A protein has these predicted regions:
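Extended alpha-helical scaffold and adjacent linker segments that couple domains
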Residues: 1-76, 80-649
Length: 649
């Protein structure tokens, strides 16, 4: 199957989109903008169509709805919709070209348009600026808030259909809330003027208001604005303002925006349909194999609307859309630009659909964008990618000869960017979700499953909660255990090993030997040999060879009483296993039963204990003893018996 890099043509600058360069200024942009060129790069969302329908009906004198409130976070497309409405209201011919099917589209001519951006603070306040734009600069000669009568008089004198837009007002209210006036603040005066303006618009037949809020930002200013809106709407009889959401990030229309803004051309519909069918076959195979749930087949149905992006892209982005500072539509557009850069210029040129797994962490722009959304630098550098090439995912991919670990980790990273704490916050993906999203024609799921299991065991910042895997700023249990193991005192590790050897080879039947000595001084060994047959366990670090160990014991007559158990191989593995057990035991001392990672710790401790036992028996596999006067050696039975005494016997 051909990649999207082969089938699609990008617009100029599609790989270098920056949030700051996309910010629109309503007051500046509606003057002198080429409407046709503007709409050539605009995708008509449901929110835009709804806004235009309501505005046109009101401006044509055919609706009692006097305005709308655009609700979405910063960067959610509110200003863009206002700009669309302004251009269409002022240009009858453009209206007919762009949205010919809207009712009443031909029922009025060019509307008067006034726009105010709340990040500006003109000396005559917002009401003076609106009056100036309507051609009546002297309508409000004082700084007192106009009452509804004064506003109605302004609208009447301006004449004709009238569109008034107020964008980003919470910062405006917030600033004036710091300016005292009488028993309150200037913001109280502005709030009164704002309410009066909305009430006047309701009572003026062809006046339509568009106002925007900033959800999740400027809390104090938003409270003033919302209070003014409630005062204007709550007349007990009529609903004056409707709410419109510019873009639904969870739906498919965001893909229409991305396609329109980033791509010059896409392949024909029949090619896209073929891609969808190929993905369907791959998903069906996964369902039959029990790797995927039947719901995964829905992705194939969505590809025609989301191509060249995977349907999961907006679903994962929706997890962090409410992050403070993430500018929703603008932010997602920049994020998609970084994804395409990973495909066109990075390591993911084979992508048949652009998904979160294709972000290339070696690109500085990708790392910077992820850092802007949520600072997970530690997770990225330790677990996924760093310039030294020793992040866990990099090591796994080098060993396995594919990029599945990095790609799985990048998908989990994108799903982990939500920062708002609370019961509603969801981070991460369940393993079956990840397998669903990485399933593609010619891409087996098995390598991803194996890579994910290794990441779960080795990554320092990968956590699990309610079956979902996610990266966090805080190190996980793996990291804590690694630190304990790394800093374990050598003397304590030696003592742990001694205790385990004494336990493993303890003589219950006493048929082969009567007692065990481990890492003891030569004089103690000789004293024990004078009494009974002894299994003496020696550490290679104490004597380089069994013969050297015998020489260290010196001369003793009871040579037939000696069985020397010597570690012949794997001492490094044994030390590592002992350190893991030490770390797990130490962590268990600090965790109570109610700790969220207690069950995981107990499972690890059991596994580490079992691995240590196996390492002990595999290492100490060489039994040396005297047969007559000859010092001989016997390899112990390693057929799986865990009882050391039975192995020696």
């Amino acid at each position: 199957m051909k990649s999207i890099k082969e089938l699609c043509e990008l617009r100029d600058g599609a790989l270098e989109v920056r949030v700051g360069e996309q910010i629109e200024n309503l007051e500046e942009d509606i003057r002198g903008t080429d409407g046709r060129a503007f709409f050539a790069g605009t995708y008509v969302t449901r929110g835009l169509e709804e806004l235009v329908r309501k505005a046109v009906a009101r401006l044509a004198g055919q609706s009692s709805c006097a305005g709308v409130v655009l609700k979405q976070a910063l960067g959610g497309g509110k200003t863009h919709l206002m700009k669309c409405a302004a251009l269409l209201a002022a240009d009858p011919e453009l209206r007919r070209e762009v949205m010919p099917g809207v009712p009443h589209i031909n029922d009025f001519g060019a509307a008067r348009v006034a726009a105010f951006n709340g990040r500006n603070r003109p000396p005559g306040f917002f009401w003076g600026e609106i009056a100036r734009q309507l051609g009546l600069p002297n309508a409000f000669t004082t700084l007192e808030a106009p009452d509804s009568g004064a506003w109605k008089n302004l609208f009447r004198r301006a004449g004709g259909p009238l569109l008034v837009m107020l964008d980003e007002m919470p910062p405006y209210f917030e600033y004036y809330a710091t300016q005292p006036s009488g028993n309150g603040t200037v913001a109280d005066i502005i709030s009164n003027a704002y309410t009066n303006m909305l009430v006047a618009a309701r009572e003026t037949g062809q006046a339509f208001m568009i106002v925007s809020t900033l959800e999740g930002a400027h809390a104090r200013g938003s409270r003033f604005m919302n209070h003014a809106l409630r005062d204007a709407v709550n007349d007990g009889e009529r609903r004056m303002l409707d709410s419109v959401t510019p873009v639904e990030l969870e739906g498919n229309e965001i893909y229409g925006i991305l396609r329109r803004r980033l791509f010059r051309s896409l392949p024909p519909e029949e090619v896209i349909a073929g891609v969808a069918e190929d993905f369907r076959r791959s998903l069906e195979e996964g369902v039959k194999a029990g790797v995927l749930d039947a719901a995964a087949l829905q992705d194939a149905d969505s590809i025609r609307q989301t191509y060249p992006f995977h349907p999961s892209f907006s679903k994962i982005a929706a997890l962090f859309k409410d992050n403070e500072g993430f500018q929703q539509t603008r932010g997602l557009l920049e994020l998609a630009s970084r994804l395409l850069k990973s495909i066109w210029q990075g390591s993911s040129g084979d992508a048949c659909l652009a998904g979160a797994q294709h972000f290339d962490p070696s690109l500085a722009d990708v790392r910077d964008k992820f850092r802007d959304i949520a600072r997970l630098d530690g997770a990225l550098a330790r677990d996924i990618w760093n310039e030294q090439g020793d992040a866990f995912a990099q090591e796994l991919d080098r060993r396995n000869g594919h990029a599945c670990a990095t790609r799985a980790a990048m998908m989990l990273m994108m799903s982990s960017l939500a920062e708002n704490a609370g019961a509603e916050t969801v981070r991460g993906l369940a393993p079956r979700e990840l397998f669903r999203y990485v399933t593609a024609p010619g891409a087996a799921v098995a390598p991803f499953r194996e890579a994910l299991e290794e990441l779960r065991g080795r990554a320092w910042y990968l956590h699990e909660e309610d079956g979902r895997l996610y990266f966090d700023r805080n190190e996980n249990l793996t990291s804590k255990l690694a630190s304990y193991a790394r800093n374990a005192p050598a003397a304590r590790i030696r003592e742990l090993l001694r205790e385990r050897l004494l336990e493993t080879f303890a003589p219950a039947e006493k048929l082969a030997y009567a007692s065990v000595l481990c890492f003891e001084a030569p004089d103690r060994v000789r004293a024990a040999l004078a009494r009974e047959r002894v299994l003496y366990i020696a550490m290679p670090g104490d004597a380089p060879t069994p013969e050297a160990c015998m020489r260290a014991l010196g001369d003793f007559p009871e040579k037939n009483n000696l069985l020397l158990l010597y570690g012949s191989r794997g001492m490094g593995n044994l030390d590592e296993a002992a350190r893991r057990v030490y770390a797990a035991r130490r962590a268990a001392q600090t965790m109570g039963n109610g700790h969220p990672q207690y069950a995981e710790l107990q499972e690890r401790l059991n596994n580490d204990e079992h691995s240590w036992n196996a390492a002990v028996l595999a290492t100490f596999d060489s039994l040396h003893y005297f047969h007559g006067s000859r010092f001989t050696v016997k390899k112990l039975d390693t057929s799986g018996k865990d009882n050391g005494e039975i192995r020696v016997r």
